[in-house]
Amino acid sequence: STYTMTIDVTAVNDAPTANDDTINVVSGTPATGNVVTSNDTDPDGDTLSVSAIAGGSPGSPITGTYGTFTLDSDGSYTYTVDTSNADVIAWQSGDPPLTETFTYTASDGNGETNTATITVNVSGSNDAPTAADNTVTTNEDTDHTFSESEFGFSDVDGDSLDHVSIETLPSN
């Protein structure tokens, strides 16, 4: 005997895949990009968006440990380093990066979501030293050896004084 069987296949919405991201940023230069278009996918081809971010909401700045992070609903982001942060100021070339993380939720717009973590690696920069104006008085025809303290040298990075250039001297 012969049987006829009908099978109905109903498509279901599959969850998107939100992949972890790493952002490398240097103090003084904001980092920008897009966490959704860089590596997140949806098996159904749905357009993905950021529906949530831990500690805030899409489009609103979040103050992190080392800077401010803004993640918009389209996945675009900006991370700006807080150049007044003591750890950022103290960062030296060769030090490991300062790291903080943010977790976001990607949505396919049809009820399915997935989460991923954004790791931000912050590197400082070599900041210029400062010097304070100073007057040094010495007797005529007498040698004077300048000391570092007479130049009011200061460096937030902790670097030592390398050299000094005297550009003008008073005339008699």
Predicted segments with their positions:
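A short beta-strand segment in extracellular, disulfide-stabilized domains
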Residues: 30-37, 144-150
